[in-house]
A protein has these predicted regions:
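A basic- and aromatic-enriched beta-loop-alpha substructure that forms the phosphate/nucleotide-
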Residues: 36-115
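Short, small-residue-biased leader/transition segments that mark boundaries at the very start
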Residues: 2-6
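A short beta-strand-loop structural module common to alpha/beta enzyme folds
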Residues: 21-32
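Short helix-capping/linker segments at secondary-structure and domain boundaries
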Residues: 18-22, 73-81, 205
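Active-site nucleophilic cysteine motif
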Residues: 7-10, 62-64
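Short active-site loop/helix that positions an aromatic residue
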Residues: 10-19
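Hydrophobic beta-strand segments of well-ordered beta-sheets in folded domains
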Residues: 22, 35-36, 163-164
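C-terminal accessory domains and tails appended to enzymatic cores
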Residues: 27-29, 53-58, 101-231
Length: 231
């Protein structure tokens, strides 16, 4: 029996996110006269086994999931973030699928393959794995949309920056806006009371543009207030 690949599960998960009512049928050949979308078989646009299947500019070959994401991703989260997500999430899965280089997420999904001596139906195992992949993918995409929604709020605070310190009225994902900016620090209300302060990293070195003094590290609130001069 055919072992299910991670590309199958995430491809199906992506399609179900785009259309929750879609009916997905596994098979080894495209039925004659079939007019629906086909991936991973059939030598069509979403079958990476086809001759001259596309390869990314960085050399990472596409698998079915990557081909579907290239088509659908920009419609879900916009072209810029779709490209970032391809690089961080989709490409490693495509690379493992094409080369067998190893990927921990692929190993987790592979745990849903039916055992060689088990009684589980392959289609049931596939459905369970797709449900996991769909839940994971949906949360990743919603996280990206959350960052997108924060952009206007963070940019507004950046416009009020003083002494390279950005003050947010509430916590919001700030890195995409502040790392490329001249901001060195960001402060916002802490869930534990008071305020939280973070250094903004440099885009190239990934180190704080201006680190806090080493002597502040690990100090209790009272001592930190004394050393920093901030009550």
């Amino acid at each position: 029996q055919r072992q299910m690949c991670i590309r199958d599960r995430f491809s199906a998960a992506l399609l179900k996110i785009c259309n929750p009512n879609i009916a997905i049928q596994r098979g080894f050949a495209v039925p004659q006269g079939f007019a629906g979308l086909v991936f991973d078989i059939g030598d069509g646009p979403f079958d990476h086994h086809a001759k001259n299947s596309p390869v990314r500019e960085n050399g990472v070959p596409y698998a079915a999931f990557g081909l579907l994401w290239r088509e659908l991703g920009p419609q879900l989260i916009g072209p810029v973030d779709a490209g970032r997500f391809d690089e961080s999430f989709v490409q490693p899965l495509d690379l493992d699928d094409n080369t067998g280089c190893g990927n921990q997420l692929a190993n987790i999904i592979a745990a849903y393959n039916p055992r060689w001596d088990g009684e589980d139906r392959p289609d049931d195992c596939f459905a369970q794995a797709v449900a996991l992949a769909q839940d994971m993918l949906a949360h990743k995409l919603e996280g990206i949309r959350s960052v997108q929604r924060a952009a206007a709020e963070v940019n507004e605070a950046l416009g009020r920056m003083k002494r390279r310190i950005v003050r947010l009225s509430r916590f919001a994902p700030w890195k995409q806006q502040l790392i490329p900016s001249k901001a060195r620090f960001v402060v916002y209300p802490s869930q534990r009371g008071g305020w939280a302060a973070q250094c903004v990293n440099d885009r190239l070195t990934r180190r704080p543009k201006r680190p806090f003094p080493q002597g502040w590290a690990g100090q209790p609130p009272e001592e930190l207030a004394k050393r920093s001069g901030i009550p």
